[in-house]
């Protein structure tokens, strides 16, 4: 296995003078698993409990010392300490319709969500009172551990489960974290793709997952190449009716390789791109290819990516009980997985069962597609924007029309 050794630097969307390092959080299977897939290196946000005004009176000498310290920190560590009240990403929950579903009493109860990532730091205050199932393919620990260089798994779990500051999308789901990626000696998060495949099967066979959330991915194999292990595992579980939500990838722009990440390229997977708080597609969100292969085109509702969700400057739980801001399709993936959990709570007949064959996935994906269009208007798909922006409440309404599947 060749490890990814190059780190790219990208300007922050709202502040081009601040440069962030790309988050190296996905395995390097045969040079195809990209660190870019999971997003940028988060910028740490230090909370202050009480601040009456966003400015302070200090002497000139102290001001110069503070300014000098900040410049050194930004240059050395590529993160910026923000001495303001702890911000949130409430817009992401409100604009996506998630808070509307939560107002109906939905919180994910009874739905099994399995996340494959770097592990989790369950000591963060965002998870107070939470119990989870933990499977460790990295170190064999029986207790929850975070192996990520920047606590990537903790960040993703916080979006879904947070119990404080910013309530997660589906905070009461039955949750499992499967650790398959870890920080290496170079400070990067890497892993073996075969472990990702094993984790996907564990989510199915041991945890009985309804939803598998994958904020990771790699490059789609070229025509004629053997199907990868993670793609095979993903295809197997989706054909059994288990929902898989995966990141589209973060290589959008002039260097885009022309398709979403793998295993997000599997037809029945819900593949997610990112948009900002104004509903604009994030420039680094990966585009999809209209073709499955040289002889077959993708069909509705499986065009890639399927949907955009909030993914720019999202606040979530991080290492050392701090809160971080991150951007990328990793974040967006969790918003869609959590929204789906709320829908499955309300309509449990759509959950996988022993005789499921994937038809309910097809129906739910059709509902997702229709939730972005007006009545009697044919769906329109864009290779970067998908069918449109996530509206969890409309998705719920469309899902309510599904009969037996």
Regions found by a protein language model. Give the residues of each.
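Extracellular S/T/G-rich loop segment that most often corresponds to the catalytic His/Ser-adjacent loop
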Residues: 117, 261-345
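Subtilisin-like peptidase catalytic core
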Residues: 2-15, 47-55, 144-222, 273-276, ...
């Amino acid at each position: 296995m060749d490890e990814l050794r190059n780190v790219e630097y990208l300007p922050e969307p709202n502040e081009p003078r601040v440069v962030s390092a790309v988050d190296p959080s996905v395995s390097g299977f045969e040079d195809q698993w990209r660190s870019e897939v999971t997003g940028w290196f988060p910028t740490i946000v230090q909370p202050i409990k009480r601040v009456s005004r966003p400015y302070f009176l200090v002497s000139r000498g102290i001001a110069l010392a503070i300014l000098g310290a900040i410049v050194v920190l930004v240059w050395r560590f590529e993160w910026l300490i923000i001495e303001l009240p702890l911000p949130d990403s409430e817009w992401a929950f409100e604009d996506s319709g998630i808070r509307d579903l939560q107002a109906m009493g939905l919180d994910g109860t009874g739905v099994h969500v399995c996340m494959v990532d770097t592990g989790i730091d369950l000591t963060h205050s965002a998870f107070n009172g939470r119990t989870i199932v933990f499977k460790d393919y990295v170190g064999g620990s029986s207790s929850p551990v975070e192996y990520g260089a920047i606590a990537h798994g903790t960040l993703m779990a916080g979006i879904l489960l947070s119990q404080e500051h910013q309530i997660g999308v589906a905070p009461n789901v039955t949750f499992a974290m499967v650790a398959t990626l870890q920080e290496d000696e170079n400070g990067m998060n890497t892993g073996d793709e075969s472990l990702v495949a094993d984790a996907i099967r564990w989510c199915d066979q041991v945890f009985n997952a309804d939803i598998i959330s994958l904020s990771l991915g790699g490059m789609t194999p070229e025509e004629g190449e053997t199907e990868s292990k993670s793609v095979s595992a993903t295809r197997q579980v989706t054909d059994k009716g288990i929902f898989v939500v995966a990141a589209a990838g973060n290589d959008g722009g002039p260097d885009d390789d022309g398709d979403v990440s793998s295993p997000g390229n599997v037809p029945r997977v819900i593949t997610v791109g990112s948009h900002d708080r104004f509903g604009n597609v994030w420039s680094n969100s990966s585009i999809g290819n209209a073709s499955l292969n040289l002889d077959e085109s993708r069909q509705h509702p499986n065009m890639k990516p399927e949907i955009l969700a909030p993914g720019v400057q999202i606040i979530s739980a991080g290492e050392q009980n701090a809160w971080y801001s991150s951007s990328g399709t990793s974040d967006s993936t969790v918003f869609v997985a959590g929204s789906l959990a709320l829908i499955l709570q309300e309509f449990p007949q759509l959950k996988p069962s022993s005789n499921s064959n994937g038809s309910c996935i097809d129906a739910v994906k059709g509902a997702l597609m229709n939730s972005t269009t007006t009545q009697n208007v044919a769906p329109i798909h864009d290779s970067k924007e998908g069918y449109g922006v996530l509206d969890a409440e409309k998705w719920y309404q469309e899902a309510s029309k599904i009969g037996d599947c």
